[in-house]
Regions:
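P-loop NTPase switch module centered on the Walker A-proximal segment
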Residues: 1-93, 105
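Helix-rich terminal scaffold detector
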Residues: 2-25, 41-44, 111-112, 138, ...
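C-terminal effector modules of nucleic-acid-centric enzymes and ribosome-associated factors
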Residues: 5-8, 146-149, 153, 163, ...
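Residue-level signature of catalytic and energy-coupling elements of molecular machines
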Residues: 13, 19, 38, 66, ...
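Conserved nucleotide-binding/hydrolysis micro-motifs of P-loop NTPases
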Residues: 14, 25-26, 91-92, 115-119, ...
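Conserved Switch II/interswitch segment of TRAFAC-class P-loop GTPases
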Residues: 81-83, 88-94, 102-126, 130-155
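Conserved catalytic-core segments of large NTP-driven translation/proteostasis enzymes
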Residues: 155, 162-324
């Protein structure tokens, strides 16, 4: 059974928590103790029905404040598919949380309040979806019950959003009119909107293709651990453990060790105490090489037929995630897979004004700012362009003074400075 990872995003009070709660409740994905807590809760909607948003409450402190201040994950499954939901906060100051939640998602659900239409947060969330190249977008126009299930309201919002989607080059966009409070078109098709002839949200989620139309097929395995037991029984054992981030590698395949450039071939593949002929994307394996070449943690084993980019100067889209602004005089740590490299922001190309999607010159980056920069590293980085291979096209920036993650980077190209 395959897994669909998706994120929900919307402005404050657009009904994300209620939508997720309705999805879990109506699909029968609630455990007995959760159901009991739900029915015994004093939290009710204005019409006296159960407040399904309770099902997505996170930490106690978050519940007491009445907001969700981190990315909350929920898991459920139907007969057709397993699902992992990332619930991102709607507040503008939590844009970084949306980046975190969307980075591992394959689909985004963007909620729009039917009474308010497209908001600045709608544009911001859609821009992030475009930036992270999520292949599918579902626009749920929520609270249709509050506008008398009006087809004209739905069509007006749809037309307004399509203009944004065209600017952002969002190609796979589906629109569903819903009422999370009443349950219309969440799991079951709505009887109140006979003019809508599409699928319910759950039916769409169960049937949408999760395999990329043109997957990146070239093998990449960052080395996380060099295994040398140093025992009498395993004196000559030398394996390289890591997770396949793209493509596949087979026994006897020729590979290159990056960044050193040494060439060798694979002699054996181990997986969970078994010997395999092939390692595919997502598998954590141990590779053995035919030649005794120098391989260290942080190096990458790549298929010889297709080499990644390798550079000390990288153009990257950039989301600043720290309360302290960017300091271009500081040497930050670039974390790319298991490798840390010293680096600095060499140039700020531009920042994006989210309200109108225009690029403008800038001299600094503050919390939740998004734009493009040039990174200069102390050692070469082995990477692919994010749009071609997201699994090998992103990194984070760490401030060595605080050990905090301060930025997310999406690699776009190598440059000569």
């Amino acid at each position: 059974m395959d897994i669909l990872r998706f994120i929900t995003a919307g402005s404050v009070d657009d009904g994300k928590s209620t939508l997720i709660g309705r999805l879990l409740y109506d699909s029968g994905s609630i455990l007995a103790d959760q159901l009991e807590a739900l029915h015994s809760s004093n939290r009710k909607n204005d019409d006296g029905t159960i407040d399904l948003a309770i099902l997505t409450d996170g930490l106690k402190a978050e519940r007491e404040q009445g907001i969700t201040i981190d990315v909350a994950y929920k898991y459920f499954q139907t007969e057709k598919r397993k699902f992992i939901i990332a619930d991102a906060p709607g507040h503008i100051q939590y844009t970084r949380n949306m980046v975190t939640g969307a980075s591992n998602s394959e689909l985004a659900i963007i909620l729009i309040d039917a009474r308010n239409g497209v908001s600045e947060q709608t544009i911001r969330h859609s821009f992030l979806v475009s930036l992270l190249a999520l292949p599918h977008v579902v626009v749920c126009i929520n609270k249709m019950d509050m506008v008398d299930y009006s087809e004209s309201v739905f069509n007006e919002i749809k037309a307004a959003y399509l203009q944004i989607a065209e600017k952002l080059n969002l190609k796979e966009v589906t629109f569903i009119p819903v009422s999370a409070l009443k349950g219309d078109n969440i799991v079951n098709e709505s009887q109140a909107m006979p003019w809508y002839e599409g699928q319910s949200l759950l039916h769409y989620l169960e049937t949408v293709a999760v395999v990329p139309e043109h997957p990146f097929e070239h093998g990449r395995m960052p080395v996380q651990w060099v295994i040398r037991p140093q025992t009498d029984a395993l004196h000559d054992y030398r394996g390289y453990a890591g997770r396949m981030v793209s493509g596949s590698l087979k026994v006897n395949d020729d590979v290159v060790v990056q960044p050193s450039g040494f060439q060798t071939s694979i002699s054996r593949i181990e997986f969970a105490e078994q010997t395999l002929e092939k390692a595919d994307k997502g598998m954590s394996v141990t590779l053995h090489l035919k030649d005794d070449v120098d391989v260290s943690r942080g190096d990458m084993l790549v298929a010889i037929s297709n080499q990644p980019l390798r550079s000390k100067n990288i153009v990257a889209d950039f989301c600043w995630m720290d309360s302290r602004p960017l300091d271009t005089s500081v040497m930050y740590l670039l974390q790319h897979h298991s490798k840390q490299i010293r680096c600095k922001v060499q140039e700020i190309c531009y920042k994006v004004n989210i309200s109108n999607l225009e690029e403008h010159a800038a001299t600094d980056f503050k919390l939740n700012d998004i734009g493009r920069v040039v990174i200069k590293t102390s050692d070469p980085v082995t990477f692919d362009q994010y749009e071609q291979n997201p699994s090998n096209g992103g990194a984070i920036l760490i401030d060595p003074r605080t050990n905090l993650t301060v930025a997310a980077l999406l690699f776009r190209q190598a440059v000569d400075l």
